[in-house]
């Protein structure tokens, strides 16, 4: 076949947790384009200790997409192990099996640290309605988190939750709201109305209204979580 990206990765010990994440990320088109276009080179801070990981990731990705064969990611693994020692993440310093989700979190964090930069984020215009006010609050939250260290990883992998707490006491209702960034979802596996499992049912279950316990008399409290914005790559 002439199709690219059909390259396999050899395990180095029990490193299938790393290889599976590498294959998933290398087939994420937005992140792949960021690497193959060399855009990352203009943002990479070579003085940072995480830079070696990104450079070896670049080599790994190009080998995965250069020809259909089997590639041994020795240098990439060594950069992971070296950085794990520096960051006191002992689970990634050897050749033992590990959790793929934990490795993905570690890799994205290190990648972000290597290419992040301070950016200017301004809020302009006046709110015309309640939705505009919510949008401003959401953007302020986004600015607070990322104005000093924004990166392509944030752009691709981060979304925002919108959480509303409703309290009803003696017939009077009060609401509070907050925004929070996220880059991974932990979903409970849920069946749909047909008895089958699907992603939509899992997301609906994640965002259902929750009745919160309270020790106050004549008081009812509810919590509702919604997605304000979704990342381009949802994990």
Language-model segments: residues:
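UBL (ubiquitin/ubiquitin-like) substrate-recognition surfaces
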Residues: 1-235
